Structures are given as C-alpha cells and as structure tokens.
Amino acid sequence: MEQQPKINRIQWLFGNVCNYDCSYCPKHLHSNSAKFDDGDLIANAVQYTVSSLRMLDREPSFEFVGGEPTLNPGLLSICQRMGNQRLTNKLTTNGSASMEWWEEYYIYFTEVEISYHTEFADIEHIEKVINFLIEKKLTVTIMVHCTHIDQQWNKAIHVYQIFKNKEY
C-alpha cells in the first residue's frame, strides 16, 4: 500500500482589507492599511512552496485569511498556480462575494469557513452561498459572531437557530 504524503498546513494572511466594519473587530484587523500584495508575486511564492514541499514528499494545504480574502484581485492567479492537482485548501471568508465569484473560485477549495457577522451579513445571500458550496461537495463551516449588544446577540441566536434547523 502506497503511503500518503504528509500534509503541511500553511495559513496565508493576505492583509487587512475588508468590506465589513464590525463593531467588535479590532480596527487593525480591518483598517485597509495592509493592502494586498502583487498577485503574481504571491502566486510565484505559492508555486515555489508547492513544488518545494512536493519534492520532500509533503503535500501543502493552504488556508487563506486576512481581512476579506475574496476581495484580493490576485487570488485567481494565486489559486491557478498551486499545482496541477487539487489541494486541500481552506478559505476563511465573510461569504459576501457574489455568486459569480463563488462559481469561478470554488474549485480551488475543499473547505470554506464562513464568518457570519450579524451587523452586515445578508442571510439570504449567505444561504445561497452555503447551498451552492454543499452542492459542490465542499466542507462548509459557519461561525456566527455574537457581541455584547443585545440586538446583535439576539440576531446571532436567531441566525444560529435558522442554520441549525437547516442542518448546516
């Protein structure tokens, strides 16, 4: 029996560019001060990392985070340079990207973690994204963020119950 390669997990923080301004999130995590690096530069680094690890019989597994990674204009280039076989990549996102975005990019990920932020998230859109990703056989994890503000707390509990009832 052939031995499976060892997995190296790599968390890639793109910056702090985000389309949300959540009250509970520290400003330095979404201030848009750390802009996205050049997509080709990162794509080259990703390609080098993939090649180097595979020469060591190791398989890379990337997790893309940072602000809101779906806003990174270089993400497609980065994903396309990961190698010719599907990697076990994870995307941590607020889920706000358009359905067109998801239709183009989902193939580069095996897992998507959606942070549901009650102050900004559109539940109907998030449900469409979740259903689409599940239909495409991706693992989907949902984090519903709560705050000390009563209105947001109640909304978070309500959204959690909706997601739980739908067995997400």
Features from the language model and the residues they span:
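Generic alpha-helical hydrophobic packing signal
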Residues: 104, 167-168
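Short, well-ordered coil loops that connect the C-terminus of an alpha-helix to the N-terminus
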Residues: 20, 84-85, 165
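Short boundary motifs at domain starts and secondary-structure transition points
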Residues: 1-4, 52-54
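Active-site beta-strand/loop signature of hydrolases that rely on acidic residues for catalysis
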Residues: 66-67
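Basic phosphate/pyrophosphate-binding loop/patch that engages nucleotide-derived ligands
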Residues: 161-167
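Phosphate/oxyanion-binding active-site loops and adjacent basic polyanion-contact surfaces
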Residues: 38-42, 71, 122
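Canonical Radical SAM [4Fe-4S] cluster-binding loop centered on the CxxxCxxC motif
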Residues: 2-44
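Radical SAM/AdoMet-radical enzyme domain recognition
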Residues: 47-63, 72-159
